[in-house]
């Protein structure tokens, strides 16, 4: 009796301190039970250790301490025949600890035991819900280790458990997760398409009131549809989902702001009502207002948000209020795909990816700034400041750091591509140097970014007229990825740079690169690579004077660029080549029309090199037609644009970063010392390579959603075949 009274008293005191936000004192009350000389019942100690571990995971970085409490609690529970919910909670929390510590084999073994227990108890709703929880976590461990078949099997088991209890939100959670795995492994188009159709079918069965309880499920489903469309380079159909995401994110943000204002007012009212000397009439009015505010908060809030779940945040242990979360599913999963801030940034990124090829540079620049600011704020919360390197990271922060660092690289990649498109080479330099510096500080976490950095160095080098260096960096990029599609793109870009040099040796190298690519377009995962290969091959055929075949190839590439990709810059470049071809075939009427369209697009994009390219062909056209007045007017405009380009190039070449970016050398990395912390970092980060929840289709290791690498400029396809324009 004495022990029970002491425990009740300490639990009550812990409740009091927790309501006041005094987490340290709350933990001390619970630790007093665990360390007391008084003999408590096993259940008392178990409940105390469970609650203590949950607090440590949520409010501190002491994962090992939490793990010790949970392991002790699990031992105590073995002597208790029932108490299944406590056992399930213990298994789930301990699994989270192993996940945060990157102890994946122990986590997998623990989850298998938890599933065995869940299948052996009476099969009520609680047992099925916990089966969903454990299958979800088990699938995640398999994904981290790139065991996609086992992950799909675990997710299918979770789906069946959700189906047994007719829980459509959970069914959708597992269906979307299976689509996610299919997108990551992408064995064939048919399997992924079937997974997409299954998601659409399940989504139709969920009523709107249920989706409101799990707002993250909508974002997860829509984002996966965007990834799927981008992977197919189906940018036009991806746009519909991007628009839905953007509208939903704005609506959700406004809703959360309203709720936060209500909560702030409610907190102020509660403080006023706590005064003992408050007049009764005023107290009555404040109480009525309090009731109104609480009803409004309840109406706006997801039903699961008001429940204090024992589960910690699914990713990491950063304490965040429920208004900052986008829950994927109901309790006891309550998981997030990514934190709300990461989803916010990702939506901005999708808007950039869909808008940049269309030349919507003002909106894209604004979104890039917003996304980078969100990421910078989160990196600071994770302790990543200017001097921090990956070896300095807390182990529990590695996963979440990688999410935001990878997102940051995606934004910087798009900034480089955007600035190169509109001929702002100094801005492109700065963004590319930022990418390089982040990579040298976090080489293991950002290992997948090295290929794209080399590719962008090649694009920058080509843009400023360093064609040999451009080819070098594109060839180096092929060595840094196992993606056949990415390798094909890099080789195509290198071939264009070689063709721009124009001498016999370089043309031979271009032929060696393009020849093997020509026969493999059907084996590539997207039309983006095919468009790049067709451009390079068409250019080669033009240099070989096989004009009719060149026209056929370029016409096919133009159709892809226009119908599937919607990339105005690539369309302008294709049109320029086709206009020049028409001129070479003495079809001056068609040449004039094609070149006018190309020049219009190049002007819209502020793409000065392409404008100059078109203007030089116009000069040849007017000379052929004997239109002296048009020729002089055209030359005057061309000279103006030439001077503008030379000014920009001089500024870029005069930058302190120019030499290091074009130099024929890979990025030098600092050496990792052989200490346990850094070895652990390498092991855990390598286990996650390629498995960030942003699939390849966004642009790191696989088909980039918008061809930042279509910077195919500096080519003179007029009379002086193969000569440099600069």
Swiss-Prot record:
Its main location: nucleus. Transmembrane segments: none annotated. The keyword Repressor does not apply. It is found in: Nucleus; Cytoplasm. Interacts with SCC2 to form the cohesin loading complex. Belongs to the SCC4/mau-2 family. This is Sister chromatid cohesion protein SCC4. It comes from Arabidopsis thaliana.
């Amino acid at each position: 009796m004495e022990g029970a009274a002491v425990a009740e008293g300490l639990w009550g005191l812990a409740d009091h301190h927790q309501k006041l936000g005094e987490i340290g004192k709350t933990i001390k009350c619970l630790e007093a039970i665990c360390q007391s000389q008084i003999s408590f019942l096993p259940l008392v100690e178990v409940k105390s250790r469970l609650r203590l571990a949950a607090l440590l995971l949520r409010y501190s970085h002491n994962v090992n301490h939490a793990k010790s409490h949970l392991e002790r609690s699990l031992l105590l529970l073995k002597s208790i025949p029932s108490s299944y919910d406590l056992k399930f909670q213990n298994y789930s929390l301990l699994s989270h600890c192993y996940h945060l510590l990157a102890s994946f084999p122990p986590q997998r073994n623990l989850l298998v035991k938890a599933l065995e227990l869940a299948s052996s108890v009476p099969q009520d709703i609680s047992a099925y819900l916990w089966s969903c929880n454990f299958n979800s976590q088990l699938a995640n461990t398999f994904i981290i280790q790139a065991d996609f078949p086992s992950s799909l099997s675990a997710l299918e088991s979770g789906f069946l458990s959700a189906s047994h209890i007719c829980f459509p939100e959970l069914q959708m959670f597992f269906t979307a997760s299976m689509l996610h795995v299919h997108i990551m492994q992408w064995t064939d188009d048919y399997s992924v398409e079937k997974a997409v159709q299954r998601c659409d079918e399940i989504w139709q069965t969920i009523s709107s009131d249920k989706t409101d309880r799990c707002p993250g499920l909508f974002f997860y489903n829509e984002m996966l549809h965007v990834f799927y469309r981008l992977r197919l380079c189906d940018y036009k159909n991806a746009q519909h989902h991007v628009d839905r995401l953007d509208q939903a994110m704005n609506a959700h943000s406004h809703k959360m702001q309203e709720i936060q204002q209500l909560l702030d007012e409610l907190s102020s009212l509660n403080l006023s009502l706590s005064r003992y000397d408050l007049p009764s009439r005023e107290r009555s009015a404040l109480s009525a207002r309090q009731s109104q505010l609480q009803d409004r908060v309840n109406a706006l809030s997801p039903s699961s948000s008001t429940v204090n779940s024992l589960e910690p945040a699914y990713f990491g242990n950063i304490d965040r209020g429920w208004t900052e979360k986008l829950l994927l599913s109901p309790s006891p999963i309550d998981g997030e795909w990514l934190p709300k801030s990461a989803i916010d940034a990702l939506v901005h990124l999708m808007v950039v990816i869909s808008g940049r090829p269309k030349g919507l540079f003002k909106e894209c620049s604004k979104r890039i700034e917003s996304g980078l600011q969100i990421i910078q704020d989160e990196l600071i919360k994770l302790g990543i400041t200017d001097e921090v390197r990956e070896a300095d990271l807390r182990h529990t922060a590695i996963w979440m750091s990688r999410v935001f660092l990878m997102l940051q690289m995606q934004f910087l990649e798009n900034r480089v591509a955007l600035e190169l498109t509109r001929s702002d080479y100094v801005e492109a330099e700065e963004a590319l140097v930022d990418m390089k510096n982040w990579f040298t500080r976090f080489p293991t976490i950002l290992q997948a970014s090295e290929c794209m950095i080399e590719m962008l160095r090649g694009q920058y080098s080509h843009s400023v007229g360093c064609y040999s260096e451009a080819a070098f960096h594109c060839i180096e990029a092929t060595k840094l990825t196992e993606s056949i599609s990415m390798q094909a793109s890099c080789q195509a870009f290198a071939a264009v740079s070689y063709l721009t040099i124009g001498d016999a040796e370089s043309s031979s190298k271009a032929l060696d690169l393009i020849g093997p690519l020509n026969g493999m377009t059907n084996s590539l995962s997207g039309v983006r690579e095919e468009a790049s290969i067709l451009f390079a091959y068409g250019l080669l055929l033009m240099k070989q004077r096989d004009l009719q075949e060149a026209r056929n190839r370029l016409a096919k590439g133009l159709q892809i660029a226009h119908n599937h990709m919607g990339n105005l810059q690539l369309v302008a470049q294709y049109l320029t080549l086709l206009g020049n071809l028409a001129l070479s075939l003495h079809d001056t009427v068609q040449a004039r029309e094609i070149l006018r369209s190309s020049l219009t697009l190049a002007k819209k994009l502020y793409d000065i090199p392409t404008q100059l390219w078109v203007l030089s062909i116009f000069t040849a056209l007017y000379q052929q037609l004997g239109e002296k007045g048009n020729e002089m007017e055209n030359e005057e405009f061309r000279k103006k644009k030439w001077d503008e380009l030379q000014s920009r190039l001089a500024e870029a070449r005069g930058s302190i970063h120019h030499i290091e970016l074009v130099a024929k050398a890979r990025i030098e990395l600092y050496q990792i010392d052989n200490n346990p912390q850094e070895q652990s970092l390498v092991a855990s980060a390598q286990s996650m390579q390629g498995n960030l929840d942003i699939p390849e289709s966004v642009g790191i290791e696989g088909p980039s959603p918008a061809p930042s690498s279509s910077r195919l400029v500096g080519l003179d396809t007029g009379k002086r075949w193969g000569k440099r324009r600069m």
